[in-house]
Every structure is written in structure tokens, then in C-alpha cells.
């Protein structure tokens, strides 16, 4: 998400790591999954264990192709119903030249893998250990299905699997939300990526780029902040508003940089958020305190799926299905009021106004978790970056990025893939 937000809709140089690392990473997962899928039947162990492990591998493969398609393929609404260029679909251990499949064929493979994974998980009657949130299980397959279907604009399928995915994961409490709810698995987390003191990425981790309490220099000197435009739309009664340092009356900051080096805003930050700031951190207006590292410099488990996203997937899908305004209103009330995030929340909106409400609360609830760029791409909506005086970006980044800009936000295939896979020669952008 960091790479996508910074360069994904503006530039993508074929031989730079920003472009090729996601390709390498997800195809590495796919290759490992293929090895398991091809060989698990001949491994030792019970049939139930084999079914469970194969289901996990299929889920990893489906998840990886879903992520790759969002980066390296056109958004579904621009794909001519999936007939546009997709990805090389490697589903075995062969390494020869391989042309791309269509985007529809990519999603067909994702669905097929998840259907088989769900069947195998169910037949195995096994589940992961309670502490192994990083290990895929049946609910992870459901969640992957829900997100993939949403991205494909398969609304009924997205809603169906979102309900199944969240069934065993109640929304986190307010105390969990504001204190470590995004670096350590809790009751709401469906699936996460493991990271701990004995196995971590040090200064390359997500939390070493975004954690407000991280000792990493990028976090101490350039704090991640919410846009003023979004902050102002969060109700005062909403606990999520307290996750950001919004200036109050009489609190000032340097509008050319966003920094507050002294004064009332600085003093309040150092007092009210002392346990969420590294001792030498710079203070910025609208800086975030939602994403915290569990240990230095950037240790923390990275959430991949949680129940809140599933509520929002079902709500968005309902808006497109039509005739489900009442159900969608109830979903938003459950997420915002019943959870305790905003006890004063109500929703009576209908039609397109209701869809816009869902989109707004998707931005609020999932802020900082890696969704904005992907959402704006699939929504086919412009990203509007405002300058520091308006509470957001440095002036040179304060631009508007249209959905049609830069190859419709579609990343180019990495040079290494094109150089060694001659079957892709006709697909060079």
C-alpha cells in the first residue's frame, strides 16, 4: 500500500523495486503454493491434515493472484467484462514461457482455487491453533473470496462471503481499537502476517514506516497524517477522531510544512499522546496514533483481514445490488454505533447518498491499513491531494490524479519478467 500510494498512480519504472517487488513477492508465494499443491498428496500424514494444508496453499495462491490483479491489471469496470490483459497464470511447477490470461480467466482461477480450498477446509474438519492468526483457515478463504468478488464487481458473491468471513470475529472493543488494535491480533482479526522480535524486517517493516511510536527516522521526522478533509468528516462523538492530532482553536502549526515545533498543539501532543510518540519525534498537525509498533524499530503483526472490512464489503455490495437500503443502514449502525465507536451514529440515507456514506466510513474505519489507493482505483474516482495549508500534502504533491491518468493506474510488468518470458513481448506497455 505504501508503494501504491506513493508511485502506483503516478509513475512505475519497469526496473525499479517499487514495480517489481510485489510481482516477485506474490509469485514467490504462488510458486511455494504450487509446490505444496502438487506434492501434498504423496506426503506422510493423515488425509485430514493433507486436505487442510492443501486448502491453505490454495488460499495463498488465490490471495496472491487477487493482489497482483489489482496492481498489474486494469480495474474491472475498464476491462470490457474481463477481456482485457490479465496475468501469466502459473498453476504448476513449470518455468517456461507463459503468455498472459485474460482478467476474467484470472478471476476464474481465483474463484476455482477458493472453491476447492473451502471444500477441503470443510472436509478436513480441522482448524488452526488459537494463537496462529497468521495461518489461513476456512474464514480466510471466505474473506479472500469476499474481497476478490468486490474487486470484480460480483456484488452478490461479495456480500455472501463477507457474512461468512466475519461470523466468528466480533468487532474489537474501543479500548482495543485505540491501544494496540492494529499490531497484535485480537477478536476481530481474521488473518495477519507474522512479525515478532525473533522474526522481523527491522527498518523495512510496515510499522517502521508508519508507526507513530517507532524509532525509525522516517517515522520520527515525517509522521503519517490523515487529510484534513477526511478528519473534518469524522464526528466529534466518534472515538476514531481521537486517533489523530487535529488542531483545536488557538493551536497553530507551520502551514508550509505541517509541523508544530512549539506551542499549544505541540504541548497537547506530548501530554495526551506521550505513550504513542517516540521521545525524539517531530509533531505534525493531523498526525496519526492508530498504527503503533509493538516493539522497536517496527515490530508488529500486520492485519490482512478483519471483520470491519467484511461489514463494509457487504454494505457496498448491497448498494449495488439494490433494494437493500434498510439492510445496509443496519450494517453501518452495527459497525459504528453498536460497536461503541460512535454511540451517536444513525443512518437514514438511501440510494447514492447511502453508497457515499459507505465509502466515507470505509475511508474512516480502514484508514492507514492499505485500502485507499486500491479503493479509488476500483471506484474509478480521482485522488485529490490538497496542500499543507489545507491540512494535507507538501505543495509539490498537492495534485489531482484522474482515473484515466498513467495507464489507468495499472503497473507495468517488471523488466525481468518481460526479458525472460518471450511470450510477453506483445504485452509491453
Per-range role (PLM):
Residues 201-220:
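Acidic-aromatic pocket-rim loops
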Residues 1-8, 13:
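Single conserved hydrophobic/aromatic residue that forms the stacking wall/gate
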Residues 17-207, 232-429:
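Acidic/polar-rich alpha-helix caps and helix-coil junctions
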Residues 185-186, 213-218, 224, 228:
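Von Willebrand factor type A / integrin I
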